Amino acid sequence: MPASLQMSSFELKEVGTGRFELVGEMSFDTADKILESSRRLFGNYAGLEVDLSQVSKADSAGLALLLEWKAQANQKAGAINFLGMPDSLVAIARTTEVSDMI
């Protein structure tokens, strides 16, 4: 059964095996809570896919979250792919020269 964790300004839900959707904010206000939720939901999947197309607000804390997810996936010898990345995150990644890391 797909899992879902909803907080006040975001929801991270499993939409298929190893496939997740994030809805709401990826910001300084939510990044630590999203990370905590993801640890419970992502489990031991070797491959992950996270749809970000429903993210309504994203800042540099959101980018840091993506980089943390990448690092965690690499530690497990797995992969994580991001779909529908918000333009604001793409711009921050380019400005900070980490776009090749995500």
What are these regions (language model features)?
Residues 25-102:
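Amphipathic alpha-helical interaction surfaces in cytosolic regulatory modules
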